[in-house]
Curated annotation (Swiss-Prot):
One of its GO terms (molecular function) is ATPase binding. Belongs to the peptidase S14 family. It catalyses: Hydrolysis of proteins to small peptides in the presence of ATP and magnesium. alpha-casein is the usual test substrate. In the absence of ATP, only oligopeptides shorter than five residues are hydrolyzed (such as succinyl-Leu-Tyr-|-NHMec, and Leu-Tyr-Leu-|-Tyr-Trp, in which cleavage of the -Tyr-|-Leu- and -Tyr-|-Trp bonds also occurs). Its main location: plastid. It comes from Pinus thunbergii. One of its GO terms (biological process) is protein quality control for misfolded or incompletely synthesized proteins. Gene3D superfamilies: 2-enoyl-CoA Hydratase, Chain A, domain 1 (3.90.226.10). This is ATP-dependent Clp protease proteolytic subunit. It comes from the Eukaryota. The lineage of its organism: Eukaryota, Viridiplantae, Streptophyta, Embryophyta, Tracheophyta. The keyword Repeat does not apply.
Length: 196
């Protein structure tokens, strides 16, 4: 039997009585965001909307993004990364569990030196993939050019945000590279490993 999303009490400023809201809505009010699934358009849009709202509400308060993400779609992931760079508040990224594929790309998007991994977190990087395309050769060629542009952008971001040489990033993105939290810190994906 599924538990569902727990409800917690929340009292808005000026209210005398608390109301019951789902856990995530309560945490969002505290500027705590969660990416705990594959990245798709829906979750990316929700998180980007929350970031814009929280930035407009108070651009001086940091936002904390907790990540337990096995990957997901490239386009929404790049959009989420770009939004993290565009808003005024610093975004802390905290890897809890796994940040793989697009999840690791979101992890590096946090404000330096505010990228954190919990002690037993696992991080995996690799290149963006394109799904099998069932269309004309011209359409496939256009899609492959677009995938190449995205791959180049993601590679540049990893180079800039990890300080690894370009050859290292290009080599490592050509395969699945798994890292522990301490290995990810040495690589430059995170700045801090939280103490257990």
């Amino acid at each position: 039997m599924p538990v569902g999303v727990p409800k917690v009490p929340f009292r808005a400023p000026g209210d005398e009585d608390a109301t019951w809201v789902d856990l995530y809505n309560r945490l969002y009010r505290e500027r705590l965001l969660f990416l705990a699934q594959d990245i798709n358009h829906e979750i990316a849009n929700q998180l980007m909307g929350l970031m814009v709202y929280l930035s407009a509400e108070d651009s001086n308060k940091d936002i904390f993004s907790f990540i337990n993400c096995p990957g997901g779609s490239v386009i929404p992931g790049v959009g989420l990364f770009d939004m993290m760079q565009a808003i005024v508040p610093d975004v802390h990224t905290i890897c809890m569990g796994v940040a793989a594929s697009m999840g690791s790309f979101i992890l590096i998007g946090g404000e330096m030196p505010k990228r954190i991994a919990l002690p037993h977190a696992r991080i995996m990087i690799h290149q963006p993939a394109s799904s099998y395309y069932d269309g004309s050769a011209a359409d496939f060629h256009n899609e492959s050019k677009h995938v190449t542009m995205l791959r180049d952008y993601i590679t540049r971001c990893y180079i800039e945000r990890t300080d690894q040489p370009g050859e290292v990033i290009q080599r490592d993105l050509n395969r699945d590279v798994f890292m522990s939290a301490t290995e990810a810190q040495a690589y430059g994906i995170v700045d801090v490993v939280a103490e257990g």
